[in-house]
């Protein structure tokens, strides 16, 4: 089990005949597409394909945010029992992950809002609805990340004070 989660850029390049994705590592965002496990997935419907990738991306953020929340609760339980610096460091790593998530999600939000306003890209009838769903998922992920970050900051401050008091 990882104690932190990071983000990596994923580029999508669209030409007349192809769609390229560029990433420094293999990414789970694209795995389901490559395995043929995404319904209504057609590469010739370029805009929809891009929106499906973005939806999968937002969904994965939500999934990992829930994992981070559970992990922080587990670490907090351990802190209640031991009050060691080690658990505080684990919480710090989770907080760092949330900071990366928030930064990345906010960048995604700007791109998604621009995609909604651009008329020059071909959209199929359901594409606008799908893009709006992506925007909703992304906004939900931003809110969750902000809430979890606030809770984690408060928890770390409280336990740091407890540890400091115990040492005095």
Describe the predicted segments one by one.
Residues 1-89, 113:
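Extended alpha-helical interaction modules
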């Amino acid at each position: 089990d990882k104690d932190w989660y990071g983000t990596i850029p994923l580029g999508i390049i669209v030409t007349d005949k192809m769609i390229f994705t560029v990433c420094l590592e293999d990414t789970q965002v694209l795995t389901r597409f490559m395995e043929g496990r995404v319904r209504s997935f057609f590469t010739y419907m370029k805009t929809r394909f891009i929106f499906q990738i973005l939806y999968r991306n937002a969904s994965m953020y939500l999934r990992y945010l829930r994992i981070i929340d559970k992990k922080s609760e587990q670490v907090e339980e351990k802190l209640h029992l031991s009050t060691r610096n080690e658990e505080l460091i684990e919480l710090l790593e989770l907080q760092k992950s949330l900071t990366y998530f928030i930064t990345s999600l906010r960048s995604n939000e700007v791109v998604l809002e621009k995609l909604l306003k651009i008329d020059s890209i071909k959209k199929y009838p359901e594409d606008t609805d799908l893009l709006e769903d992506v925007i909703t998922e992304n906004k939900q992920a931003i809110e969750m990340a902000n809430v979890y970050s606030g809770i984690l900051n408060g928890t770390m401050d409280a336990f740091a004070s407890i540890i400091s008091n115990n040492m005095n």
